Regions:
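Cytoplasmic juxtamembrane interface segments
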Residues: 1-10, 74-99
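Alpha-helical transmembrane segments and their helix-start/interface "positive-inside/aromatic belt" motifs
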Residues: 3-23, 95-105, 158-162
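Hydrophobic alpha-helical membrane-insertion segments
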Residues: 21-32, 100-117
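Membrane-helix interface motif
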Residues: 32-47, 117-127
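Perimembrane loop-to-helix junctions flanking transmembrane segments
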Residues: 41-62, 130-137
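Alpha-helical transmembrane segments and their immediate interhelical/interface regions
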Residues: 55-84
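Hydrophobic cores of alpha-helical transmembrane segments in multi-pass inner/ER membrane proteins
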Residues: 78-79, 151-160
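Individual transmembrane alpha-helices with interfacial aromatic-anchor signatures
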Residues: 137-151
Length: 166
């Protein structure tokens, strides 16, 4: 009666959904923490400006910046999850196809990491270079269109992770 073999196995679909949910939570936390630390530097640079910028525009720019870093955090955690799944599969099967997938995932991972650094660099440099022209600090390249692209990337990686874990 106490021996139920099916109770010890988790359904692969459930396992995939739980893993994706956990990776999203971890990605949100990572992106938010990175944004908190990098925004301190950006706000310090912003406070050095000789002009006064509308606080509403600053808040909007901070929200765009934080949202972009959260999206990148989710992408990074999904890519780590995919790398784990494909590396595990490669170790079991020794398939050359999985080597190619791992290389592709590593390239996307490096792109996402560099995007985090470039977002911070763009924001800092933009404050220093053109404070009088823009009157805000994150206008170039930071708008709703970025979040559409990030959303599609996250959905695509989530689907790939789900199908790979199933």
């Amino acid at each position: 009666m106490g021996d139920m073999p099916y109770s010890k196995k988790i359904n692969p679909k459930t396992k995939a959904i739980v893993a994706i949910f956990v990776l999203v939570i971890i990605g949100v936390i990572i992106g938010y923490v990175i944004s908190i630390f990098s925004l301190e530097i950006i706000i310090t640079e912003l406070n050095k400006l000789p002009i006064q910028i509308n606080p509403v525009r600053i808040d909007r720019s901070i929200n765009y910046y934080t949202g972009a870093l959260i999206c990148l955090g989710i992408e990074i955690t999904f890519l780590i999850g995919l790398l784990y799944v494909y590396t595990d599969s490669f170790l079991k099967t020794k398939s050359r196809f999985l080597i190619g997938l791992n290389m592709f995932i590593i390239a996307l991972f490096i792109k996402s990491l560099l995007s985090v650094f470039s977002l911070h660099s763009i924001a800092n440099d933009y404050i220093r270079v053109s404070p009088y022209v823009s009157r805000t600090f994150l206008t170039p390249g930071f708008n709703e269109l970025n979040f559409v692209v990030y959303t599609f990337e996250i959905i695509a990686l989530g689907i790939l992770l789900y199908l790979s874990m199933e």
